[in-house]
Amino acid sequence: GEPSHPHVPWSKTVIYELHVKGFTANAPWLPPELRGTYAGLAHPATLSYLQDLGVTSIELLPIQAKQSELFLQERNRTNYWGYSTLGYFAPEASYATKQAQEAGAGAVRQEVIDMVRAMHEAGFEVIMDVVYNHTCESGPEGPTICWRGLDNLAYYRRTKDKVSRLYDTTGCGNSLDFTNTHVTTFAVDSLRYWAKRIGIDGFRFDLAATLARLDGEFT
């Protein structure tokens, strides 16, 4: 059966924030093939290390599928931290083991599910950083990958004086328009997916205030 989700009283919660790849990339207790991976984070030795620290909850920096910004790609660099989301319903494949990557998306997803299950069995709550304030499509000079091609005017906020001008409250080139119910539904559906299908216990919203900012005010 599925392990029960730990429920730590807020007064006793100790959150440890980590990057799946960065935290395990040089872990001496892991075999090389597990370093930098979801499976490496789920390894008993990794979980034992975290237990020894006395933390109760693990906050994962973004693990939703990402794509680096164009200006980074042009310099042969990547957005290491993952705050450039491409797939809100998909885990980032580059953090999976080589075996899972070669097996395909289903195997990558299963590796994430197994990681969360192992954390629960070890007594940890699992929190995930999520980025709904902007997408990887960046500003006007950015690529058309998904939302811009589907319905540019509906998904992204615009300035009042010029509908063609993106209203950038994030400093990342665009801002998703949460005054549009379709955008809100999309975000909630993806959160529900991660909670119900993957097993995530909670979420930390990047630049949360921008999600409800309207005409310069938080509503």
Placement of each model-derived feature along the sequence:
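The feature marks proteins involved in alpha-glucan
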Residues: G1-E17, T24-T37
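Substrate-binding/active-site clefts of carbohydrate-active enzymes
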Residues: K21-P44, S48-G199, L207-F218
